[in-house]
Amino acid sequence: MVSPMSGYTKKNLKQDVENQAPNFGMPEELNARFARTALGGETLGLSLMNLAPGFRIPFGHKHANQEEVYVVLRGSARIKVEEEVVELGELDAIRFDKDTMRAVEAGPDGVEYLAFGAGDDPRDAEMVQGWWSD
């Protein structure tokens, strides 16, 4: 639903926003719904992420010009932030400075989290395959 007269857009993140993970060659253990376009966001981005139990995103990433905040909705995760591994549980929030490399690994029950970011340049992200290896 878009209401230009009232200045808002309403979307259901699971019903109205397509899982983009397959479009980026990601395995079925990752479900990534990027809602910026669906919501008509100009500078604010929102993503709904679901990772299967024990799945680790196969790359680290950072942004040159934007902060991000992740909020765990269900399950648990470990996040490698630069050289530190941080444990997260339900309703934990973590903020990343720009230029901070990170990667997520789901806990034993999987994890569902929201990622919030500000910025509108897709070239802002840097991804490093295999960044978090044991």
Protein language model features and the residues they cover:
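A generic "binding-loop/recognition-motif" signal
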Residues: 65, 84, 100, 109-110
